[in-house]
Amino acid sequence: MSRSRASGRPRSRRRECEFTKLGIVPDYKDVKRLQKYLTAQGKILPRRRTGVSAKMQRRLAVAIKRARHLALLPVAPSHTR
């Protein structure tokens, strides 16, 4: 394993895009899979956290927004006191 010069720690392998690996496209009807890419506050997670390719991240964002529009996903989390 190669080491980076600045920190001396081993570099981590780049994660492969889950959608590309499985050969699927993000779909607004697949709510369970879409929820994996949201924070507890309902925000879309960035690529650097999920390991999704740029193309699939754009499609994922569109699918999440469609699911929100159709009320399959919450736009904002329910607040509890």
UniProtKB/Swiss-Prot annotation:
Presence of keyword Transmembrane: no
GO MF terms, alphabetically ordered: small ribosomal subunit rRNA binding; structural constituent of ribosome
InterPro entries to which the protein is assigned, alphabetical: Ribosomal_bS18 (IPR001648), Ribosomal_bS18_sf (IPR036870)
Domain of life: Bacteria
A Gene Ontology biological process term: translation
Keyword DNA repair on entry: no
Keywords of this entry: Ribonucleoprotein, Ribosomal protein, RNA-binding, rRNA-binding
Coiled coil stretches, renumbered: none
A cellular component annotation (GO) from this entry: cytosolic small ribosomal subunit
Pfam families assigned to the protein according to its UniProt record, in alphabetical order: Ribosomal_S18
SUPFAM superfamilies: Ribosomal protein S18
Quaternary structure note: Part of the 30S ribosomal subunit. Forms a tight heterodimer with protein bS6.
Function: Binds as a heterodimer with protein bS6 to the central domain of the 16S rRNA, where it helps stabilize the platform of the 30S subunit.
Family: Belongs to the bacterial ribosomal protein bS18 family.
Protein name in UniProt: Small ribosomal subunit protein bS18
Source species: Chloroflexus aurantiacus (strain ATCC 29366 / DSM 635 / J-10-fl)
